[in-house]
Amino acid sequence: LSPEGLRSRLFPLVYFQKQAPESVLEHWNIWVGRQPCEGFELRAGEIEVRADDVQMWAEETEDHQVSLVLYCEKLTPILKEDTDKVWWALSMLVDQTIGEVSAIAFVAGFDVYAQPKDEPAKLLSELPELLQSMGLSLWRDGSDYLENSYLAYELKPVEDPEADWRLDVYTGSCRLPVLINDYLTARSDMVDEYHKDGIAAGFLLYPLSGFTGEERVKAILDFRDNLRDAILRDAGEEAVTFLGGATGLYCGYLDFIAWD
């Protein structure tokens, strides 16, 4: 099951994977994300290319990912006529080299060059070793990755108590940051895509005025954990997936995906 390179699509696919009945799993192995395949050769129309045919220049980003520049002599003639096909081919090769989930986790993006850079290059087939040298372990399955993909963030809160929800947030963690970014910028692309499949994404909020004393921070986090556990106990894991939470000046927030 391919998320087509999008973290947001991993969640529905992992949910589908976990809901598969035992009668299906007796005959099928369900993997989320294209698996790495050493020696993979892509053949599509006039394209016949391997990872060994692609030169690679990698730069580590501040958030411990890599930004790639790729050059492939075999694809250069096609680049002028059909840029999208070349990007698709190279994206496919990256996925097959390190696995699609690892590509989502570790590749910040890549550029395609029509000429090689004047710097020593590695081959794309060496990307797994490069990532491992950075202390990164490749992910085989989308479920394992999502369970360990929390991103911590800090924001400058709006002090006006009448401001919109979440604008008071100063710290939080989330497994799907695009959901928060879309909300704060009044975009609905991802939520609209989820709604088409009967999926609802949102957050619960609760006032923090009742939390006082030296243990206030711990009490707020404990309450959020207890709220999450109570919902999971009563609704069941098949009904909801929690994405993280946030603490604001006036409210606490619990982010979730609800499944129909």
Q: Could you say what each language-model-derived stretch is?
A:
Residues 2-28:
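An N-terminal, globular interaction/scaffold subdomain
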